[in-house]
Design a protein with these regions (language model features):
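Non-catalytic signal-transmission and effector/linker regions of two-component phosphorelay proteins
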Residues: 1-5
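Two-component/phosphorelay signaling modules centered on CheY-like receiver
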Residues: 13-31
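Acidic catalytic/metal-coordinating carboxylates
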Residues: 34-38, 61-64
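Short amphipathic alpha-helix used as the core "switch/output" element in two-component signaling
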Residues: 41, 63-74
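Active-site beta3 strand of CheY-like receiver
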Residues: 46-52
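Receiver (REC) domain active-site loop signature in two-component systems and cognate sites
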Residues: 57
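Alpha4 helix (beta4-alpha4-beta5 surface) of REC/receiver domains from two-component response regulators
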Residues: 64, 85-96
């Protein structure tokens, strides 16, 4: 039995493998994608309990992806992951 369905969008997914394995061991089903377009496509196909979203990806940025995901699934919680400390990025993400 699954504890929940997670979507993780990050262009450096290979670096996150240990975290994904940890979540899977804890009973979560984790769908991984490497860009915003694929994340949006997955949100059209499935209902996720939580989305982990990198801010800096090729193609659509994390913020652009977040806006489209919130249009499709406004109640789904999204955690933005970024190395940036720029306040405007945080403000934009919170405002979405």
């Amino acid at each position: 039995m699954s504890n929940g369905l997670l979507l993780w969008a990050d262009d450096e997914m290979e670096l996150l493998r240990a975290h994904i394995l940890f979540l899977e061991k804890k009973g979560y089903d984790v769908v991984t994608v490497t860009n915003g377009t694929d994340a949006i496509d997955q949100c059209r196909q499935k209902t996720f309990d939580l989305i982990l979203l990198d801010e800096m990806m090729p193609g659509l940025s994390g913020l652009e992806t977040l806006q489209q995901i919130k249009e499709l699934s406004p109640a789904t919680p999204v955690v933005m992951v970024t190395k940036s400390e720029e306040e405007n990025i945080m403000d934009q993400a919170i405002g979405s």
